[in-house]
């Protein structure tokens, strides 16, 4: 069996990636989230596949087909709740994974980090298109508002929006293409996750100290497979509790009303995992400026390897950077709260201050803190 595992053309790839993979002996539970993201992706693909068997991407029947899935399809209600709440768990794991990489300096593996940013962007696009599919009020108006942002692009903006819509408004053609992309993009994510892992295994995992761990490594199996399995059990428990006890806690009540182009909801907002970016978008009074700020709030992550000034990789022994990291975390939670509030005083000014702080911490305060810490340890 050992010979087959190590020399069979297919099994040896699995063996090198998940069994005999040399892993630092001191990595903590924060390193579990990569495997949890893989589990979330598989869950979303499987539940989505079963939902796609009964869903009809047509403006006249999309909403009723969702109702049909929940009422008439065997276990359709639980499949739908697992899929919609699974997206929330997915983003919770994703943001935690990114936060851990920032804290421990893993972004210095630039290829792994850049493929991770690409994965984040594709995940966000997939989730946005999925939110449109039930064709409720918030689905329709969310699609209208977010796609309309592209009209801010000079010269080609209006044509680009009509091209995305497939007409002069969000309609059947839009829903059809969103369904097609929502179905195919997760498979693209699987391929990109493979590339992500390939780059990671080229360099090996980082560790909490941020030091090279070549002299102290252990095999991935059984030590970390058991650890990951425990994390997976907790994830499944959390997802089932959410889907069975309070399935609508993270959703919007407006989405239980069929889409009505003649009736605008009082407060159009995306799902909770996009609220921080939505708050940054709204904090800029100019439309083009807001769109640029929205995209930069994600793309700014790509600058992190270039902005690293500290001689230490990890923040574990850098108290000043730790304070800034947790300030950034609180700032993102504040932006998430602001995004869920109406556009009025005092939420406008709080959103603007939080947005300025977000960009300031990443672009200025963290690099300056790194230089100060370098000076202090001389």
UniProtKB/Swiss-Prot annotation:
User: Which cofactor names does the annotation list?
Assistant: heme b
Q: Which residues bind heme b b562?
A: 83, 182
Q: Where does a ubiquinone bind?
A: 201
The domain of life is: Eukaryota
GO BP terms: namely: mitochondrial electron transport, ubiquinol to cytochrome c
Q: Which UniProt keywords apply?
A: Electron transport, Heme, Iron, Membrane, Metal-binding, Mitochondrion, Mitochondrion inner membrane, Respiratory chain, Transmembrane, Transmembrane helix, Transport, Ubiquinone
Pfam families, A to Z: Cytochrom_B_C, Cytochrome_B
Annotated GO CC locations? mitochondrial inner membrane; respiratory chain complex III
Transmembrane domains' residue ranges: 33-53, 77-98, 113-133, 178-198, 226-246, 288-308, 320-340, 347-367
According to Swiss-Prot or TrEMBL, what is its membrane topology?
Answer: Multi-pass membrane protein
| Gene Ontology terms for molecular function | metal ion binding; ubiquinol-cytochrome-c reductase activity
Location of the protein in the cell: Mitochondrion inner membrane
Sites binding heme b b566 sit at: 97, 196
Record's cofactor remark: Binds 2 heme b groups non-covalently.
Q: Extra notes?
A: Heme 1 (or BL or b562) is low-potential and absorbs at about 562 nm, and heme 2 (or BH or b566) is high-potential and absorbs at about 566 nm.
Q: State the protein's purpose.
A: Component of the ubiquinol-cytochrome c reductase complex (complex III or cytochrome b-c1 complex) that is part of the mitochondrial respiratory chain. The b-c1 complex mediates electron transfer from ubiquinol to cytochrome c. Contributes to the generation of a proton gradient across the mitochondrial membrane that is then used for ATP synthesis.
Quaternary structure and interacting proteins, as annotated: The cytochrome bc1 complex contains 11 subunits: 3 respiratory subunits (MT-CYB, CYC1 and UQCRFS1), 2 core proteins (UQCRC1 and UQCRC2) and 6 low-molecular weight proteins (UQCRH/QCR6, UQCRB/QCR7, UQCRQ/QCR8, UQCR10/QCR9, UQCR11/QCR10 and a cleavage product of UQCRFS1). This cytochrome bc1 complex then forms a dimer.
- Similarity comment text for this entry: Belongs to the cytochrome b family.
Q: What is this protein called?
A: Cytochrome b
Q: What organism does this protein naturally occur in?
A: Elephas maximus
